[in-house]
Amino acid sequence: MKNQFQYCCIVILSVVMLFVSLLIPQASSAAVNGKGMNPDYKAYLMAPLKKIPEVTNWETFENDLRWAKQNGFYAITVDFWWGDMEKNGDQQFDFSYAQRFAQSVKNAGMKMIPIISTHQCGGNVGDDCNVPIPSWVWNQKSDDSLYFKSETGTVNKETLNPLASDVIRKEYGELYTAFAAAMKPYKDVIAKIYLSGGPAGELRYPSYTTSDGTGYPSRGKFQAYTEFAKSKFRLWVLNKYGSLNEVNKAWGTKLISELAILPPSDGEQFLMNGYLSMYGKDYLEWYQGILENHTKLIGELAHNAFDTTFQVPIGAKIAGVHWQYNNPTIPHGAEKPAGYNDYSHLLDAFKSAKLDVTFTCLEMTDKGSYPEYSMPKTLVQNIATLANEKGIVLNGENALSIGNEEEYKRVAEMAFNYNFAGFTLLRYQDVMYNNSLMGKFKDLLGVTPVMQTIVVKNVPTTIGDTVYITGNRAELGSWDTKQYPIQLYYDSHSNDWRGNVVLPAERNIEFKAFIKSKDGTVKSWQTIQQSWNPVPLKTTSHTSSW
């Protein structure tokens, strides 16, 4: 009797749940990621690398921020340089510039996203300033653990080597904690915090530099050739296998000394085929693992320092190393030396560290041919898909300055069809005094998402058919019927097709519904093209007939 009662309850509950699901329209989705435009999407503007008084005066800057806000920018991101905040000595902090910047942001009624920039400014693409990291830092150790050394022996000091985790734990921890205390009075204007994870603020090795002859579009140079790095790799290998004899068995080698366990002696050959060997797989796992551990460490330090005071998301950046991607001779020959061998595993570290991820090059297109073998769009799609699968909040940037509408449209395609929660425009000077570019940005990317219900009645579907909509803007798939159409769902209660769709408020849109058969072919289109001019700022519904 008890079992019969439980069975009846389960049946009744199932019927009720089914009935409720039919009454409530489901969130519609783009075919690629199952989410459509992110309802939390916001646009950000990247501040100049130099201090504001070196570029303009504070009053003009505040007016610029008001203008940016009117054009759809929610917040301004800004680098606060370690080499400026603690240049005079260990724990001799000066946050006066950060506080003055925050005051101007507050005066303008805007938000800011501070970047705790523990790397140098200067020497990377687009840099127009020169702020090295504090000189006293290099006295913290007497060995070579604090800096990088490449295959060719080039020493790089633009940021601390993540292998120096003891120094990083102390110095970054102190910096983060002091920053939180100094900026507490301005917590209301801080929307998010970004952490520098390496060169140019990106979680990577300094594997492509002009000083090392590895600028774009060359292959990268590995950066594990200090004596400290060699010893760390050796220790990792011996811990994994237990003895030199077991190492030789696994690698198929005949090493006669533990000292012979070394990084690749020939980076070119390694990238051609050495990476396929067990030795190569181990080396790349260790090499990327250093970045993963660094991600977890700075995430831990940041959450400990910032969560209580600011209670905002914290993020870090992965670089868009898009060249040599599909080189048939050295595939991914720029990514591997940067520390990017397994993006899925790297993103797991972001997830573990509770960090949002920012990725670059949203404005670029694939070329995939000699000599660049550049595939930025494919790379963006791969990273975005992985981040969405793992539930990691995803933000984007352009890699180079944008100078035309077409590049904005490419950004919109990626941002609105791959669930980006935000896009940061690089950089302030490019749009602030260019009304044409600012207007294009506002229309295409400076948008406010709003959930609207789309209803289509009298659709002549048969069993196995599905109804989609597509339209004239990136948020609607730009008339695409394969990758980006937004799926509607059949409502048996109302006998129509409907769904909740995130749309750009106060923008004019045009769209049509169409039917796809079970095999994916387009059967027919809605007769009359629909217009919504403009999309309301408040949630409502749009109903049309087939």
Curated annotation (Swiss-Prot):
Monomer. Gene3D superfamilies: Glycosidases (3.20.20.80), Immunoglobulins (2.60.40.10). Changing residue 194 to F: Reduces activity by 64%. It comes from Bacillus cereus. InterPro entries: CBM20 (IPR002044), CBM20_beta_amylase (IPR034835), Glyco_hydro_14 (IPR001554), Glyco_hydro_14_CS (IPR018238), Glyco_hydro_14A_bac (IPR000125), Glycoside_hydrolase_SF (IPR017853), Ig-like_fold (IPR013783). Keywords: Calcium, Carbohydrate metabolism, Disulfide bond, Glycosidase, Hydrolase, Metal-binding, Polysaccharide degradation, Signal. CDD domains: CBM20_beta_amylase. The lineage of its organism: Bacteria, Bacillati, Bacillota, Bacilli, Bacillales. Binds 1 Ca(2+) ion per subunit. It catalyses: Hydrolysis of (1->4)-alpha-D-glucosidic linkages in polysaccharides so as to remove successive maltose units from the non-reducing ends of the chains. Residues 1-30 form the signal peptide. Disulfide bonds join 121-129. Its EC number is 3.2.1.2. Ca(2+) binds at residues 86, 90-91, 171, 174. Substrate binds at residues 79, 119, 127, 317, 322, 360, 398-399, 427. Its cofactor is Ca(2+). Changing residue 194 to E: Reduces activity by 60%. This is Beta-amylase. Belongs to the glycosyl hydrolase 14 family. Residues 444-546 form the CBM20 domain. The keyword Nucleotidyltransferase does not apply. It holds the Pfam family CBM_20. One of its GO terms (molecular function) is metal ion binding. One of its GO terms (biological process) is polysaccharide catabolic process.
